[in-house]
C-alpha cells in the first residue's frame, strides 16, 4: 500500500475501490487499536523538532490531504471503478441540529452509510487587498496525463508506519502545490468516515525551468485538497463549529535545488480525533504585490533549506499521540512572519460559501428526500454568504514631485531620494539621513528616469485596486495629503491633457460597469461633491438655497448604522462618465464662483468627492426574480495643504484660513496617532469630533473601509521640514487597521434566506411520510409566515425601485436648473468662439479663468444676484449695485456704461462714462470682481490701438496680479488721500482731546485754587477771632485787679496757649500759601506742556495739508494691496450698515506713536455718541458675519454683528462741545484714552487735596478701590446667608424649573431697574463713581448671580424633557434670548461704569424687552412640556410688574394654542395613516372604518377646543385662568399620547401583527374619559372668560364612546382564536415585546392590565385546511 497526495483537474474527484480494498486499507493503518483514519483537510502543525521550523527561515504550515492507495504492492496501479459509487461527504455534528422544527426532526434520523466524495479545495491569500497569480505548473490543460503525479515509494518502519516519498501532483494549469512534510491536523469530520486509497504514477510538467528542476530532483510536493465542509484557515471569517464552505488557500512551495536530490521522509501519526473540533486559527495571508501587472513572485517561488550544493535528509520520528476530546486549535507557526514576502501565492477562484441557513440546517440533508429535491436543496444552501469581514491596513504611497519654477530659479538642492520602496531624506543642516519605507513610492521628479511614475502609473498602482474592492462590495477611500504646492490637486484632479485619479477612476468605473452589466446584474451610481472650509460644509452641486435665499452651510450628523453623514447634501444619480464630468465641472466652478466675491469661501478647503455604487443582482428562485443588493461608498478626498505662516507670508483672512486648515489637519494627525496606538493593543480615545473633516472620515479611518493615502512631498531643501512632517504623518497612517466588510442589503439577504427556507420546507412537505401531523401543521404555519414576510420584502423592493426612478428624474431636473442658474453666474458649458466674453481672474491660479460670461449682440445688463433679478450677468457682493452697468455690443465694438455711482474700473481707472473695451482689457466691478475682456474677432482682425501698444505688448500675461497692481497704481492717489485724511483726522481728534484736557485741567485748577483761597480766608478769620479774644481777656484782667494774683498763673498759661495757636495758624497760613504757589507753578508747567504739544500737532497737521495740496511731491507713505483691501472692506461695512438702517459708521484710524503707525478700524455709534476700535483681524471676522447677514436679508442676530458686548466703548469726543461739559460728563470723558493720555501727569484732585490737608480741615477721603475692598466681603456674606436660608425653606413656592427660570428673570428685571434708577439719581456734580456705593455693588453681584443661575437652569430644563412638537423652535428662541440678554447686561454695566447715560438707557430698554420675550418663551414651553407654574398661584412676587405678568400670560395662552394645533395635526396624520392601510377581510375592513370614524370624531372635538381657546385668548385672562390652562395642557398631552398608542396598535393589527386587546381597551377608555373631562373644562374656562361659543353637544361625547365600543368589538372579532393563533406561533417573540411596550405605555395614562394572549390554546389544524383566511392576506 502506498501513500501519496492526489490531485485532479476537476472540482470533484472520485475515488474508486472495492470493498475488500477498503478493509485492507483500514486494517493496514490501524496500530494496536482499530483506529480509523479520518480524512479531513485542515491546518496542521509541524513538529517542534523540525529543523526547518527551528531555523526559522524556510517554510510554513500547510494543510495536506493524503490519499492512501489500497494496492498490494508499492508500484501497483490502482483499480478503477464506477465514480458514482462513492463520494466524500461531511457528516453533520450534533451541534448543527438546532435550526428549525423540521430540521430538528429530520436531524434525528441519519443513515448508517455516508457516501464519501473528495472535492477540490480552493484557497485565498490576502495582501493589502490584492490577489496574486503564479505561473501555471501544468502542461496542456486538456491532457489527462498532465494531472498524473510522480512515482511514490512507501517504506515500512516496524510494520506500523509508512514513509512518504516526494510526490508532485497538479490540479490544473493555474494551481501550483509546493510544500514540505506536515503532521496531519485534527480532523473535523465524523468518526465513521471511510477512506479510499488510490495511486498515481505520472509527473506533471512545470512552468519554469527552476521549478522543473526542483520537481525532477524528487523533492516532496504536496497538493492540498479540501471538501466542502472544511473550516477556513486564513482570510475568512469563522462561524459555528463545523460550518460548511469556509475555504481558504495556503502557500505552497518547493524544497531543493537542481544539483542534488534529498528524500524527505515522514511517518504517519495516529491521533485520537475529537468529536467537535474548534476551527483552527487564521494564519496570516501570504502573498506578494503585483509586479507591474505580471503574476511573478517577488522573491521567487521556491524555498531552499540549506545551500544549493547539498541537502541533509530529514526524517520525521514515528510518534503516537493521544488527542483530547476537545482539541485546541494548533498555534501559528513562527515562520509565518519571516516568509510573508518570500512565498508565491497562487491565484485561485474562491468557491462559493454556504449561506447562513445552510449552516443551521445541515442536519436536514438526509436520504429521505428525493434525489432531485436533495440536489435542489443543496444548490440552494450553497449560495454565497457575501457578508465578509476583513482587517486591512491603510495603504500608504508617497509621490515626489519635480522642482517648481521658483525652485528652479532659486537653484534649490535636492534632498529627497528613492531606492525602491524606501525614501531617504538628507538634511543639509543637521547632516542626518532619514529613511522611510512605504507600500508604494512614486518617483515623479525626472521624466527621463526609468522609474518615472506618471499619472497613469499612479492610478493603476494605487487607485485601480480600490476600484476592484469597490466592485466586491467594500467601502473605499483615497485621500491625498501634503503641504501647499506639493501636487495634491494635480494628483487627484490633474489637467485636461493629464487627468488625475478622480477622472480616471470614474472613467474606469463606467468602463467596467459596461463589461459587467448584464440582464442579471445592474448598477446604480449616485455622487456628491462638497467642501469643508473653516469647519463649515458647503455643497458644491447646489447653486442657491430654498426660496432663492443664499444657501446655508450644511451640518454633519451621525447615523447609528451607516456612520457620519452630511445632512441635506444633494445626491445626484449619474448614468455615464459624461454626467460625472459635467457635475465635476459644475462643482469646481461653484468653488470659483464662491471665491470670486471675497466671501467666506475659497479654494483653500478640503474637497470630498463621493460615489455610492449599488450592485443589484437578480436571482431566480421558484420562477420568481429577487434582487440582491451590495452597496459601496467611494470617497476621494483632496485635503487642503498645510503651510507655515512665516513661509507663506499669510495675513488677515489668509492667516485665518491657514489656522483653520492646520487645526483640522492637526486633529487628523491626532486621530491617526490614536488609531495607530489602538492597533498596537492600547485603549485610547479617538477625537473624531474635534474636527468636521475627521468626523466625516470616521469610517475611512479605523472603520468600515479599504483606505489608501498618497502623500505628496517636495524634493527641495527649502521645504525639508514640511517634507519630514508629511513622511512621519504617512508612517503613522500605515499602522491604522480598518475593519472592512461587504455592505450587503439585509432585506435582500433575508429574502434569499427565506426562499431557501421555503424550498427546504416544501421539500420536506412532499416527503412527509415520516413526519407526524402536528409537526406538519407547524411547518405549514411557518411557511405561511415566511410567505408573509417575503411578500412584504418584495413590496419594499418595489418601493425602492420607484424611489430610484424618482431620484434619477429629480437629478436630471436639478441638473438643468443648476445649469441655467450658473449660466447667469458665469458658468458656461457651451460657448461661441466668435462672441466677446469676460473671464474671471482670481488670486488663486486654480480658480482663475473658470467663469465665462458671454457678451451677446446688443445690450448685456450686469447687476446684483437676487431671486427676482433678470440681469444677463448676475454678481454677488455688497458693492455690486442692483443695476451696476451695461455692456453694449454693436457692430463688433464693445463698450461698458456704468450706472449711477456703481464702482466700475477699466485698466485700473474709475470710469463714469461709456468706455470702449478692447481685447485684453481688465475690468473690475465693485472693487472685488476682476475680469479680463476677450474679443476673438478683434484678435483675428489684428486691431490694436497705437496709444495702447506700449501698455499691452511690453508686459506679461494679464492675470490677477497684473490687474491688481494696475488697479493699485491707478488708485494710488485716492488711497494716499484716504490715508492722509485718516491721519489728519486722528491728529485733529488728538488736538481736540488736548484742548478738552486743557480746559478740564483749567477748570480743576481753578476750583482747587478757590478751595485754597477759601481755606486761607477761614484761617485768617480764625486768627482775628483769637486776637480779639485775647484783648478781651486782658481788659477783664485789668478790671479785676483784686484777682490779679489769683489769675496770674492762668494768665501765663493763656499767654502760652495763645502763642502756640498763633504760631500754628501762622504756619498753616504759610504752608497754604506755599502750596498755592506750587500749584500755580505746576499749573503753568502743564499749560505750557499742553501748548507745546498743541503746536507740534498743529505743525504736523499743516504739513499733512501741504502734502495733500501738493500732488506732485513724493509721499512718504506708500499704499499697498492691504490698504486697498481695507478701503474696500470699510465701504462694504458702511453699505451693509446703511442697508439695515443702523447707526454705526466705520472708518479707518491711523495712529502714529514714536514713528510707528498703528492701523485699526473705528466704530462709531451716532445714536448713543460712543465709539470703539476694532483690530483688523476682528474687523475681517465681523465683516464676514455682516456679509452672511446681508445675503440672508437680516435676522434676529443683526444687532450682534455690529455691537460686540466685549467691546470697550467710550464717549465720542468728535461731537462734544467743551462748553457743555458738566462734572459728571467730564468724569466720563476722563476715561477716554486720548484725553486720559494727555492728563497722565495730573494727579487726582482728591489725593492732592488730602496730601496738604491737616488740622481742622482734615477729612477722611473715600476712594472706590478701598470702599470695594471693604464692601465686597459683607455683600458676599449676605449672599451666602441667603443661600443657607434657602436650604431650609420648603419647596411649596418653587416646585418646577420653569418657576426658577421665571424667578431669576424677575430678579434680573428688578436689579436692572434699581441700578438704572441709582444711576439717574446720581448728582451731576458728584465726583464719586456709581459703584462706590454699597447698595449698587450688592445689586450688581445679585444680577450676575441671577444670570448664572438662569443659564444653568435652562440647560438642565432642556435635558429633563423629551423633545415635543414645536418645542425645538422655542428652545432655540429662548437660548438666543438668554444669549442676547447676557450681552445687553454687559453693555448696561459698562455704561454705568463709564457714566454714559445714553448707553445705560439704551441697554436698559433692550434688557427689559429681552426679559419679556424670555418669559413668554418659558410660558409656551411650560405648556408644551406639561410643566406647572406655581408662581402664578403665589403671585405676590410679580404683582408689582404688570408687563412681566402680561408676558407670562401671553406665553401660556400661545403655548396652549400651539399644543392644540399639534394635536389636531397629529389626529389628521393618524387618520390618513389609517386610510392608507389595506384591509382584505370583512372584519379588518370594519375595524379600519370604525377607527377612522372614531379618530375623525376626536379630531372634530379638538378643533372645537382650539376654537374656544382662541376666543379666550383674545380676552384678558386672570392668573387663575392661566393656571387652569396649564392643567388642561397636561391632560391633553396624556390624551395625545394614548391616541398615538391606540392607532399604532390598530395599524399593527391591520398589518397582520398581534396586538393586546386589554391594552387597547384601556387606552380607548382613557381617551374617552379625558375627552369628556377636557370638554367640560374648556366649556367652563370659556364661560368664565366671557366667551359665548357653541358648546360641544353631549351627544357627540356619547357618539365618541359608542364608536370606541364598536372599534373594540371589531378588534375582538379580528383576534378570535381561529385567526390569531397561527400568527402567535410564528411571531411569539415580537408579540411579547409589543405587549411589554403597550403595557408600559398604557400604565402612564390608564389602569395597568396584564398583556396575555387572548383565548385558550389553539387546537390542532388539519393538513387540509391550514389557515386559509390568513393565506388570503398574503
From Swiss-Prot:
Stretches for region Required for CIT-binding: 936-1674
Composition-biased stretches (Polar residues): 142-151, 202-214, 302-311, 1660-1674
PROSITE patterns xref list: FHA_DOMAIN, KINESIN_MOTOR_1, KINESIN_MOTOR_2
Database matches in InterPro entries: 4HB_KIF14 (IPR056523), FHA_dom (IPR000253), Kinesin_assoc (IPR032405), Kinesin_motor_CS (IPR019821), Kinesin_motor_dom (IPR001752), Kinesin_motor_dom_sf (IPR036961), P-loop_NTPase (IPR027417), SMAD_FHA_dom_sf (IPR008984)
GO biological process: activation of protein kinase activity; cell division; cell proliferation in forebrain; cerebellar cortex development; cerebellar granular layer structural organization; cerebellar Purkinje cell layer structural organization; cerebral cortex development; establishment of protein localization
Disruption phenotype: The lag homozygous mutant mice that lack detectable Kif14 expression are indistinguishable from normal littermates at birth. At P10, mutants exhibit an overt ataxic phenotype that increased in severity over time. At P12, lag homozygous mutant mice are unable to stand for 10 s on a narrow platform. Their gait is wide and uncoordinated, and they frequently fell on their backs while walking. These defects in voluntary movement control, posture and balance are accompanied by progressive weakness and failure to gain body weight.
GO cellular component terms listed in the entry, alphabetical order: cytosol; Flemming body; membrane; microtubule; midbody; nucleus; plasma membrane; spindle midzone
Coiled-coil regions listed: 743-826, 961-1110
Domain called Kinesin motor: residue spans: 393-736
Chain intervals for the UniProt region annotation (Required for PRC1-binding): 1-391
Subcellular location per the Swiss-Prot or TrEMBL entry: Nucleus; Cytoplasm; Cytoplasm, Cytoskeleton, Spindle; Midbody
Modification Phosphoserine, positions: 257, 973, 1326
Annotated binding of ATP, by residue: 482-489
Record field: compositional bias (Basic and acidic residues): 267-279, 317-329, 1630-1642
PTM sites of type Phosphothreonine: 262
Entry similarity comment: Belongs to the TRAFAC class myosin-kinesin ATPase superfamily. Kinesin family.
Subunit organization: Directly interacts with PRC1 within a complex also containing KIF4A, KIF20A and KIF23; targets to the central spindle. Directly interacts with CIT depending on the activation state of the kinase (stronger interaction with the kinase-dead form); targets to the midbody. Interacts with ARRB2; the interaction is detected in the nucleus upon OR1D2 stimulation. Interacts with AKT1; the interaction is detected in the plasma membrane upon INS stimulation and promotes AKT1 phosphorylation. Interacts with SVIL; at midbody during cytokinesis.
Name of the featured protein: Kinesin-like protein KIF14
Species whose genome carries this gene: Mus musculus
Amino acid at each position: 500500500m502506498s501513500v501519496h497526495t492526489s490531485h485532479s483537474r476537476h472540482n470533484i474527484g472520485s475515488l474508486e475501490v472495492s470493498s475488500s480494498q477498503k478493509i485492507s486499507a483500514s486494517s493496514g493503518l490501524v496500530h494496536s487499536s482499530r483506529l480509523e483514519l479520518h480524512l479531513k483537510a485542515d491546518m496542521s502543525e509541524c513538529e517542534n523538532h523540525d529543523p526547518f521550523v527551528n531555523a526559522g527561515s524556510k517554510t510554513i504550515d500547510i494543510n495536506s490531504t493524503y490519499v492512501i492507495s489500497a494496492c498490494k504492492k508499492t508500484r501497483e496501479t490502482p483499480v478503477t471503478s464506477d465514480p458514482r459509487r462513492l463520494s466524500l461527504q461531511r457528516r453533520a455534528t450534533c451541534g448543527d441540529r438546532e435550526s428549525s422544527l423540521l430540521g430538528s426532526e429530520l436531524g434525528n434520523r441519519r443513515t448508517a452509510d455516508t457516501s464519501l466524495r473528495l472535492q477540490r479545495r480552493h484557497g485565498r491569500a490576502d495582501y493589502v487587498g490584492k490577489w496574486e497569480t503564479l505561473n501555471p505548473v501544468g502542461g496542456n490543460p486538456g491532457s489527462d496525463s498532465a494531472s498524473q503525479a510522480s512515482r511514490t515509494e512507501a517504506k515500512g518502519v516496524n510494520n506500523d508506519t509508512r514513509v512518504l516519498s516526494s510526490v508532485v501532483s497538479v490540479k490544473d494549469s493555474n494551481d501550483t502545490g509546493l510544500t514540505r512534510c506536515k503532521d496531519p491536523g485534527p480532523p473535523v469530520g465524523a468518526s465513521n468516515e471511510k477512506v479510499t486509497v488510490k495511486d498515481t504514477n505520472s509527473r506533471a510538467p512545470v512552468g519554469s525551468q527552476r521549478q522543473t528542476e526542483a520537481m525532477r530532483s524528487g523533492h516532496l510536493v504536496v497538493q492540498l485538497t479540501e471538501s466542502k465542509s472544511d473550516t477556513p484557515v486564513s482570510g475568512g471569517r469563522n462561524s459555528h463549529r463545523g460550518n460548511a464552505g469556509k475555504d481558504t488557500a495556503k502557500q505552497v512551495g518547493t524544497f531543493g535545488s537542481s544539483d542534488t536530490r534529498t528524500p524527505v521522509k515522514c511517518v504517519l501519526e495516529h491521533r485520537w480525533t475529537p468529536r467537535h473540533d474548534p476551527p483552527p486559527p487564521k494564519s496570516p495571508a501570504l502573498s506578494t504585490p503585483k509586479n507591474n501587472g505580471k503574476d511573478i513572485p517577488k522573491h521567487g517561488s521556491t524555498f531552499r533549506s540549506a545551500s544549493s550544493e547539498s541537502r541533509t535528509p530529514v526524517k520525521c520520528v514515528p510518534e503516537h499521540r493521544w488527542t483530547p476530546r476537545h482539541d485546541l486549535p494548533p498555534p501559528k507557526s513562527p515562520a509565518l512572519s519571516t516568509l510573508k514576502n518570500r512565498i508565491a501565492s497562487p491565484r485561485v477562484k474562491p468557491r462559493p460559501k454556504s449561506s447562513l441557513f445552510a449552516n443551521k440546517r445541515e442536519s436536514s440533508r438526509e436520504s429521505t428526500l428525493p434525489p432531485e429535491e436533495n440536489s435542489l436543496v443543496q444548490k440552494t444552501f450553497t449560495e454565497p454568504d457575501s457578508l465578509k469581514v476583513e482587517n486591512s491596513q491603510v495603504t500608504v504611497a508617497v509621490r515626489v514631485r519635480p522642482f517648481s519654477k521658483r525652485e528652479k530659479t532659486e537653484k534649490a538642492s535636492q534632498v529627497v531620494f528613492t531606492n525602491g520602496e524606501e525614501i531617504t531624506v538628507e538634511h543639509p543642516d543637521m547632516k542626518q539621513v532619514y529613511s522611510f519605507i512605504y507600500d508604494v513610492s512614486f518617483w515623479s521628479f525626472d521624466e527621463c528616469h526609468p522609474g518615472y511614475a506618471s499619472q497613469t502609473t499612479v492610478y493603476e498602482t494605487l487607485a485601480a485596486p480600490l476600484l476592484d474592492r469597490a466592485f466586491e462590495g467594500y467601502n473605499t477611500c483615497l485621500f491625498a495629503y501634503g503641504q501647499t504646492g506639493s501636487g495634491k490637486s494635480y494628483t487627484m484632479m490633474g489637467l485636461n491633457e493629464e487627468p488625475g485619479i478622480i477622472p480616471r477612476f470614474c472613467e474606469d468605473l463606467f468602463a467596467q460597469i459596461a463589461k459587467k452589466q448584464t440582464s442579471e446584474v445592474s448598477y446604480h451610481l449616485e455622487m456628491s461633491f462638497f467642501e469643508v472650509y473653516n469647519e463649515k460644509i458647503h455643497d458644491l452641486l447646489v447653486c442657491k438655497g430654498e426660496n432663492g435665499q443664499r444657501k446655508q452651510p450644511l451640518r454633519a450628523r451621525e447615523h447609528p448604522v451607516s456612520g457620519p453623514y452630511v445632512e441635506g447634501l444633494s445626491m445626484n444619480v449619474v448614468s455615464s462618465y459624461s454626467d460625472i464630468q459635467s457635475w465635476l465641472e459644475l462643482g469646481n466652478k461653484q468653488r470659483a464662483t464662491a471665491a470670486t466675491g471675497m466671501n467666506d469661501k475659497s479654494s483653500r478647503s478640503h474637497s470630498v468627492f463621493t460615489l455610492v455604487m449599488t450592485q443589484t443582482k437578480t436571482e431566480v428562485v421558484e420562477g420568481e426574480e429577487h434582487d440582491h443588493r451590495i452597496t459601496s461608498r467611494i470617497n476621494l478626498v483632496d485635503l487642503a495643504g498645510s503651510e507655515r505662516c512665516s513661509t507663506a507670508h499669510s495675513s488677515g483672512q489668509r492667516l485665518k484660513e491657514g489656522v483653520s486648515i492646520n487645526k483640522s489637519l492637526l486633529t487628523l494627525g491626532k486621530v491617526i496617532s490614536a488609531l495607530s496606538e489602538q492597533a498596537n493593543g492600547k485603549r485610547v480615545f479617538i477625537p473624531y469630533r474635534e474636527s468636521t473633516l475627521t468626523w466625516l472620515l470616521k469610517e475611512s479611518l479605523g472603520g468600515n473601509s479599504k483606505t489608501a493615502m498618497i502623500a505628496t512631498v517636495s524634493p527641495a531643501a527649502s521645504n525639508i521640514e514640511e517634507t519630514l512632517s508629511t513622511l512621519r504623518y504617512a508612517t503613522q497612517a500605515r499602522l491604522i487597521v480598518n475593519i472592512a466588510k461587504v455592505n450587503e442589503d439585509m432585506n435582500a439577504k433575508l429574502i434569499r434566506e427565506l426562499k431557501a427556507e421555503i424550498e427546504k420546507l416544501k421539500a420536506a412537505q412532499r416527503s412527509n411520510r415520516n413526519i407526524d401531523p402536528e409537526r406538519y401543521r407547524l411547518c405549514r404555519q411557518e411557511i405561511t409566515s415566511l410567505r408573509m414576510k417575503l411578500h412584504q420584502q418584495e413590496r419594499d423592493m418595489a418601493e425602492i425601485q420607484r424611489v430610484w426612478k424618482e431620484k434619477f428624474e429629480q437629478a436630471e431636473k436639478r441638473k438643468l436648473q443648476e445649469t441655467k442658474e450658473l449660466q447667469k453666474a458665469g458658468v458656461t458649458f457651451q460657448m461661441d468662439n466668435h462672441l466677446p466674453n469676460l473671464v474671471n481672474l482670481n488670486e488663486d491660479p486654480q480658480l482663475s479663468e473658470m467663469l465665462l460670461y458671454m457678451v451677446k449682440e446688443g445690450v448685456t445688463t450686469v447687476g446684483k444676484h437676487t431671486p427676482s433679478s433678470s440681469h444677463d450677468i448676475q454678481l454677488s457682493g455688497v458693492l455690486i449695485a442692483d443695476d451696476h452697468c451695461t455692456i453694449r455690443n454693436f457692430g463688433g465694438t464693445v463698450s461698458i456704461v456704468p450706472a449711477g455711482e456703481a464702482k466700475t474700473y477699466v485698466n485700473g481707472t474709475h470710469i463714469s462714462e461709456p468706455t470702449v473695451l478692447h481685447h485684453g482689457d481688465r475690468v473690475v466691478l465693485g472693487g472685488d470682481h476682476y475680469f479680463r475682456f476677450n474679443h476673438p474677432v478683434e484678435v483675428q482682425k489684428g486691431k490694436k490701438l497705437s496709444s495702447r501698444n506700449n501698455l499691452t505688448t511690453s508686459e506679461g500675461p494679464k492675470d490677477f496680479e497684473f490687474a491688481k497692481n494696475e488697479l493699485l497704481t491707478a488708485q494710488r492717489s485716492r488711497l494716499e488721500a484716504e490715508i492722509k485724511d485718516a491721519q489728519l483726522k486722528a491728529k485733529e481728534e488728538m488736538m481736540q482731546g488736548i484742548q478738552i484736557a486743557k480746559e478740564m485741567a483749567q477748570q480743576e485748577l481753578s476750583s482747587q485754587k478757590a478751595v485754597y483761597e477759601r481755606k486761607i480766608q477761614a484761617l485768617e478769620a480764625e486768627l482775628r477771632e483769637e486776637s480779639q479774644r485775647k484783648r478781651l481777656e486782658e481788659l477783664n484782667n485789668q478790671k479785676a485787679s483784686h484777682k490779679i494774683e489769683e489769675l496770674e498763673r492762668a494768665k501765663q498759661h493763656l499767654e502760652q496757649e495763645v502763642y502756640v495757636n498763633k504760631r500754628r495758624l501762622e504756619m498753616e497760613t504759610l504752608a497754604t500759601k506755599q502750596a498755592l504757589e506750587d500749584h500755580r507753578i505746576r499749573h503753568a508747567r502743564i499749560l505750557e506742556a499742553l501748548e507745546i504739544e498743541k503746536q507740534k500737532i498743529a505743525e504736523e497737521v499743516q504739513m499733512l495739508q501741504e502734502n495733500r495740496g501738493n500732488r506732485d511731491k513724493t509721499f512718504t507713505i506708500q499704499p499697498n494691496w492691504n490698504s486697498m483691501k481695507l478701503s474696500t472692506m470699510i465701504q462694504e461695512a458702511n453699505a451693509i450698515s446703511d442697508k439695515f438702517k443702523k447707526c454705526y459708521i466705520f472708518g479707518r484710524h491711523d495712529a502714529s506713536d514714536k514713528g510707528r503707525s498703528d492701523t485699526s478700524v473705528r466704530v462709531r455709534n451716532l445714536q448713543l455718541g460712543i465709539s470703539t476700535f476694532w483690530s483688523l483681524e476682528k474687523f475681517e471676522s465681523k465683516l464676514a458675519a455682516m456679509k452672511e447677514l446681508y445675503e440672508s436679508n437680516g435676522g434676529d442676530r443683526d444687532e450682534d454683528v455690529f455691537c460686540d458686548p466685549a467691546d470697550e466703548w467710550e464717549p465720542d469726543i468728535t461731537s462734544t462741545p467743551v462748553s457743555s461739559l458738566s462734572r459728571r460728563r467730564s468724569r466720563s470723558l476722563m476715561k477716554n484714552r486720548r484725553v486720559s493720555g494727555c492728563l497722565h501727569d495730573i494727579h487726582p484732585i482728591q489725593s492732592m487735596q488730602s496730601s496738604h490737608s491737616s488740622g481742622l480741615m482734615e477729612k477722611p477721603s473715600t476712594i472706590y478701590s478701598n470702599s470695594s475692598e471693604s464692601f465686597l466681603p459683607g455683600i458676599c456674606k449676605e449672599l451666602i446667608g441667603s443661600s443657607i436660608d434657602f436650604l431650609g425653606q420648603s419647596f411649596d413656592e418653587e416646585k418646577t424649573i420653569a418657576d426658577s427660570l421665571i424667578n431669576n428673570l424677575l430678579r434680573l428685571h428688578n436689579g436692572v431697574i434699581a441700578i438704572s434708577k441709582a444711576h439717574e439719581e446720581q448728582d451731576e456734580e458728584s465726583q464719586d463713581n456709581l459703584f462706590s456705593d454699597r447698595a449698587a455693588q450688592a445689586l450688581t453681584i445679585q444680577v450676575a448671580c441671577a444670570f448664572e443661575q438662569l443659564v444653568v437652569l435652562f440647560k438642565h430644563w432642556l435635558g429633563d424633557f423629551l423633545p415635543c412638537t414645536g418645542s425645538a423652535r422655542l428652545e432655540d428662541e429662548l437660548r438666543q434670548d438668554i444669549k442676547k440678554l447676557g450681552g445687553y447686561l454687559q453693555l448696561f454695566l459698562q455704561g454705568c461704569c463709564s457714566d454714559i447715560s445714553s448707553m445705560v438707557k439704551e441697554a436698559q430698554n433692550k434688557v427689559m424687552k429681552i426679559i419679556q420675550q424670555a418669559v413668554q418663551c418659558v410660558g409656551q414651553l411650560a405648556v408644551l412640556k406639561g410643566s406647572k407654574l406655581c408662581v402664578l398661584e403665589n403671585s405676590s412676587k410679580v404683582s408689582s410688574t404688570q408687563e412681566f405678568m402680561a408676558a407670562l400670560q401671553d406665553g401660556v395662552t400661545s403655548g396652549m394654542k400651539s399644543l392644540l394645533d399639534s394635536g389636531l395635526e397629529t389626529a389628521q396624520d393618524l387618520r390618513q395613516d389609517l386610510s392608507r392601510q389595506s384591509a382584505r377581510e370583512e372584519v379588518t375592513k370594519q375595524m379600519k372604518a370604525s377607527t377612522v370614524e372614531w379618530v375623525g370624531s376626536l379630531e372634530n372635538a379638538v378643533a372645537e377646543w382650539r376654537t374656544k381657546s382662541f376666543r379666550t385668548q383674545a380676552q384678558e385672562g386672570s392668573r387663575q385662568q392661566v393656571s387652569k390652562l396649564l392643567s388642561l395642557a397636561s391632560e391633553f398631552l396624556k390624551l395625545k399620547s394614548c391616541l398615538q398608542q391606540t392607532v399604532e396598535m390598530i395599524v399593527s393589527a391591520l398589518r397582520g401583527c398581534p396586538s393586546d386587546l386589554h391594552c387597547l381597551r384601556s387606552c380607548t377608555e382613557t381617551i374617552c374619559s379625558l375627552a369628556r373631562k377636557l370638554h367640560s373644562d374648556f366649556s367652563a374656562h370659556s364661560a368664565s372668560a366671557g366667551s359665548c361659543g357653541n358648546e360641544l353637544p353631549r351627544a357627540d361625547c356619547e357618539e365618541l364612546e359608542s364608536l370606541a365600543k364598536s372599534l373594540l368589538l371589531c378588534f375582538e372579532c379580528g383576534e378570535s382564536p381561529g385567526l390569531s393563533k397561527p400568527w402567535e406561533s410564528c411571531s411569539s417573540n415580537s408579540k411579547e415585546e409589543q405587549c411589554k411596550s403597550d403595557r408600559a405605555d398604557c400604565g402612564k395614562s390608564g389602569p395597568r392590565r396584564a398583556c396575555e394572549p387572548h383565548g385558550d390554546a389553539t387546537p390542532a389544524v388539519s393538513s387540509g385546511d391550514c389557515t386559509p383566511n390568513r393565506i388570503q392576506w398574503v
